[in-house]
Amino acid sequence: FLYHAESIQESMTVNSSTMVKEFTNPLKEPIDDDINLFDFLDRRAQRDPDGSTVEYKADGGWKSFSATQFRDLVIALGKGLIGLGVKKGDAVSIVSRTRWEWTALDMAIMAVGALTVPVYETNSDAQVSWIFNDSQATIAFAEDDGQRDKIESIHDEVQSLRKVFVIDAGALEALQAYGKEVSDEEFWARKNDAHGDDLATIVYTSGSTGTPKGVELSHRNLAFLCLSAMQYMPRACAWPDRRLLLFLPLSHVFARFMELLSFCGTLTLGLSSDMKTIVKDFESFGPTLLLAVPRVFEKVYNAASQRAGKGIAGKMFLRAADVARDWSKAEQAGEKLPWRGRLAHGFYELVVYKKIRTIFGPNADFAITGGAPMDANLSHFFNGIGMPLLEGYGMTETCGPVCVSLPENNRIGTIGMPMSGVTAGIADDGELCVRGHLVCRGYHNHPDVTAEQIVDGWLHTGDLGDIDEDGFISITGRKKDLIITAGGKNVSPGLLEAAVMTSPVVNQCLVIGDRKPFVAALVTFCLLYTSPSPRDR
């Protein structure tokens, strides 16, 4: 999420650390990021022990954990990991959709100094085998029997794997049983031994070669970005009564960042992965901010247009959309619409705009979007109806957002300013580079790629960009041959083209899909003749 470039790709060129433009958004106050990420949850329990902290769907409604309840659960799970023999630096994998158990296990793993290795439930057997072997995973938590069977099918290929738990089969209860003989003192000693520059997680992301690379993120990396966000965007995460419905995969680094930011700040974290009920979940949970890729908002706009139809209602919707865009463009220019435009905007607020906003629940006042370039017309439409879409940019290698627009300072067409304490630069070849404590330690088992992509502290993003005099960043292109779909997925066209062209009937193949909700291909075919005579062809 918030990702124009989800991963760094290998390159044959040597990156330069010379910047022709540079902008730093200074911290408002010093940050102490030499902590264990569990400290965020522990501090939340101390300052708001009974407040709802994690909520999940059950029995037709929402159930909740208070901060104290969730912290105590995480401690019990951490003791279980210690009792199971998990050592500091061991890799523990979670193969599951987003659910509250994922978050509890993640916090427990990191609390005792082990490394969380997320795996998408959609990953193939071969991908799981690669990730487990590269990270040397010792324990795995599978969501259900299907994920367990996937892991068991490659168990013989992974010598490091000692035990597999199934979440749906009582994994958390079983893990807690291993910790019954582990003292509180032993847990806190392990917690205090892991902090700052110790690894917290290895997040695997595919590159242009298609081979997953593990991005090493430390407790300091993630803690810094959370504390930076508290300074940079307090309205999102530090104001009272803030609520976040997280339906993104927790295997994605941005979802993990938001999980931790919830504990660091004041957010109540709602967890759901059922996209079929997401509109009902918006209504019942009532998030105060939304997180989604541009494709989600495209679907909302298209659905509203289709419901209006082609008659009078359809014409009214098109006119309402034009007025919303005009209103937004005038606001961006620091102007007001003429009185007729203001009158029309007020009318459409009652009959069109308000109805669209209700899709996102009763409390949402803005949305953060990224993962793919945002169409400016769509941004102006939603801004004009009172639901600003704040575009941002980030990478797995930066733990989450590098920059994001703010409700009070939103320049449509840019990806906002750098987060607090983050420096952005433009290299002499136009590449956007990033520096700060949010930059990963490097690539697991790939020191050569690390040395190539992180030069003198500068992370080379592979994207071309510009920075204006106020520090707002724009993406102007990409150095790499990589397609990013409207849903934020990175697709390497070369791999697909090569696979298609293995067919004897295919002459040429060109994969397309940038900014589209699909990936397609233009294909030219060979004519295969069975007769040697041109006259008979």
Predicted feature residues:
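Conserved small/polar residues in nucleotide/adenosyl-binding loops
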Residues: 1, 205, 529-536
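ANL superfamily adenylate-forming
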Residues: 146-196, 304-355
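Conserved AMP-binding/adenylation subdomain of ANL enzymes
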Residues: 223-246, 250-353, 363
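Conserved ATP-binding/catalytic segment of the ANL
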Residues: 418-485, 502
